[in-house]
């Protein structure tokens, strides 16, 4: 099943500026592959700290694993998507 994942964080919660030792995820395509999720498309607006991805996964738990490094720092919305 396909999912749309949108995320937003504040400048203070940006991994680039946080300084808590948590490395930013700069390659979401590789992160998806690492956890067994197919990356379909993605992008973002860095100055606004917004990003999105379309992914395909057979298990919601994989999506939770995918986003785990940013949960608690980012607002993340995962929405199931089907063809219209």
Spans of model-derived segments:
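Conserved, structured core segments of small domains
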Residues: 1-84
């Amino acid at each position: 099943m396909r999912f749309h994942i949108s995320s937003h964080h504040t400048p203070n919660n940006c991994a680039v500026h946080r300084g808590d030792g948590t490395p930013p995820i700069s390659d979401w395509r590789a992160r998806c592959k690492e956890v067994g999720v197919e990356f379909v498309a993605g992008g973002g607006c860095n100055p606004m700290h917004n990003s999105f991805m379309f992914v395909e996964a057979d298990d919601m738990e994989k999506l939770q694993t995918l986003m785990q490094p940013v949960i608690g720092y980012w607002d993340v919305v995962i929405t199931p998507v089907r063809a219209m």
